[in-house]
Amino acid sequence: MNPVIELLLQRRSVRAYEDRTLVQEAKDQILEATLRAPTAGNLMLYSIVEISDQRSKDDLARLCDNQPFIACAPWVVLFAADYQRWHDLFAWSGVEETCRQAGEAMRNPEVGDLLLACADALIAAQTAVIAAESLGIGSCYIGDIMENCERTRDLLGLTPYVFPICLLCFGYPDARQAGKERSSRFERKFICFENKYRRLIRRAGRDDRGTPTRVIQGPQVDRWCRQPGAARL
């Protein structure tokens, strides 16, 4: 099997790490690879913030649904959708004045711009994950970074047109990870379609959705059910 494909198939989330610092050379290799990630129009609508301050890591662990392993991870990195850089560049380049002379207002970033920037940031994040995996460094995505984005903005100094889309924890997997099974996935027939989207639940009833990858339970259930679209599943 192609070694890249094998690496992708074997990848899993790692939440327990060796007490071992990531050397700067490894970080540099990961970041250099990340900056070559595909990006819309070569705009690179994202920013990367390395969290080295322990107090900030402790705060993020609490803000992200009280997950203590975040505070213990050797390398914690925020990937943010960033339209602020281009907005500032437009203003600095005199676009606002040009618009004023034309009798028009300078357009501020809108929802479509945010979605495009989020896509850029997530593509970059996944590139970092695979680059790290190739060096034997595990990782775990933290989506909860979005849940308290106002407090995260204050903590990390994010400006109005910067949105924290995901946090990544990196580190060398400890011995407890060696025998850990990979989580299951839906079968391909439930995910991959040809030419047109298929709403499976309408075609063959609820059973056609397959077996869930995990059962949602515990104190997070109520909050999850309040998420947009959850009631329609």
Where are these predicted regions, by residue range?
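Acidic, surface-exposed loops and disordered segments
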Residues: M1-L233
